[in-house]
Amino acid sequence: MLEILWANITPIQTFVSSNHLTMLYGLKRFGCRLYHHSKSTRYIDATAKVVSQEPAAISSTGAIPLNSPAAPLLSQDVLIVERQLEMMNVFLGYEQANRYVILNQQGQHLGYIAEQGASSILSSLSRQFFHTHRAFKADVMDSNGQLVLQLNRPFSWINSRLQIHSIDYSKFSSTLVGEVLQKWHLWRRRYELFLAKRSMFEQFAKIDERVLSWEFLLRNEQDRILGSVSRNFMGLPREFFTDTGNYVLRFTSTSAANGSVNENQLLQAAHGIANDVCARDMSLEERAVMLGSAVTIDFDYFSRIHGGPALGLNIPFMFGGSSSNHDYPAEDLSAQEILKNDQETTPSTNDSSSETKSPFLSDADLDQQDFWDIFDRDGDD
C-alpha cells in the first residue's frame, strides 16, 4: 500500500519532438511518500530533502536552460547511478525493465531512471527475445517524480545508439540534447559523445578503453580528460549472479586539476599530470549526455544474456576488469557503502532553510509499497 501524503498531479501532456511523439507524465508536483525497495539500500524516503545545488553556469546549446528542472540534478560534481536488483532476473532468468536510483556523493537521493513498459506485454517479449539489443525508452526523474529527461535507445544489432531529450514544460515539447554512439571494435570499448546543434551533431568527447575496463574516461579532441564513468565492484556473488551495479560519474570543473593525486580521481586517471585534465566546467548538455553514457555502458557490457530459467546461474555477457590500479579515497565509496549506515542523519538545505533528516525509513514502514510500482502500470509506446 502506498501512503499518499499529498498529491497534485497535472493531466497527461503530449510533447512533440522532431523525431517522435512521446507521451510524458506531467507529474508537476508529486507529494506522495515514495519508497524504493532494495535489500542492499534498504528503504529510501523520497520525501527527504536533498542539498540545494546552484545550476551549472553553462548551457552550451540551450537545450537545457539554466531554469530547466534537470539543472539541479546535473549540477552535481559527482553522481552515483545504481542499478536496482531484479529478483525475477536472479531466480528465473526473466528480464525485467531496468531501474536506477541517482544519488550524490553524500548518498542523498536525487532522482530515478525508469525504463518504460514495465508491465507491457510487447515490451516484456522484446526484453526476453532481444535482451541488450532491444529498443527502449527511459524516464529520468528528480526526487519529486517530475520528469526532467528522457533516454531513447533504438534497436541495434551491433553499434548501440542512445539519444537524450530534455523536457520543456513551458512549450509542452522535448528537445534533443545529444547522443551516445557505440563504435564497434574487437578488443576495445569505444563510444563517441555528441551534442545536437540545430540540424547536426557535434562531437565533444570520446571513450576508448581496454576490453576488460571498468573505468571509462571521456576525452576531448586534444585527448585531455573531460570526465569519467567508473563502475564499482560490488562483490563476486552480486557481480556474477545479478544485474545490479553502480556507476560513479565525475564531471570536470575549473578546479578539476587541483589537489593531490591521492584525493583527486581525475588526476589519478591522468597519472598525476594536471595538464592532461581539461579543467573547465562541463555544460548541462554535456553532463546529460554523460549520464546517458552510463546507462548505455551498463546495457552493452554489464548486462547478462539469459537463455531461460537458470536459478541465477546466468553467465555474464562480458566480464570486466578494472583499468585503474589506484585505491579511491573513502568519500568515493559505492552507493551501497554510502547507504549502509542507516543510523546517521543527513544534513540537507533548501534555499536559506536547513534541517537534519534521515533519508531512511524505520522498520515500522517496511510494509509500504515500492516506489517502482507506480511505473508498472504504464503501457507500451
Swiss-Prot record:
<dbReference type="Pfam" id="PF03803">
    <property type="entry name" value="Scramblase"/>
</dbReference>
<protein>
    <recommendedName>
        <fullName>Phospholipid scramblase family protein C343.06c</fullName>
    </recommendedName>
</protein>
<feature type="compositionally biased region" description="Polar residues">
    <location>
        <begin position="344"/>
        <end position="359"/>
    </location>
</feature>
<dbReference type="GO" id="GO:0005886">
    <property type="term" value="C:plasma membrane"/>
</dbReference>
<dbReference type="InterPro" id="IPR005552">
    <property type="entry name" value="Scramblase"/>
</dbReference>
<dbReference type="GO" id="GO:0005739">
    <property type="term" value="C:mitochondrion"/>
</dbReference>
<dbReference type="GO" id="GO:0007006">
    <property type="term" value="P:mitochondrial membrane organization"/>
</dbReference>
<dbReference type="GO" id="GO:0017121">
    <property type="term" value="P:plasma membrane phospholipid scrambling"/>
</dbReference>
<comment type="similarity">
    <text>Belongs to the phospholipid scramblase family.</text>
</comment>
<dbReference type="InterPro" id="IPR025659">
    <property type="entry name" value="Tubby-like_C"/>
</dbReference>
<feature type="region of interest" description="Disordered">
    <location>
        <begin position="336"/>
        <end position="369"/>
    </location>
</feature>
<dbReference type="GO" id="GO:0017128">
    <property type="term" value="F:phospholipid scramblase activity"/>
</dbReference>
<keyword id="KW-0496">Mitochondrion</keyword>
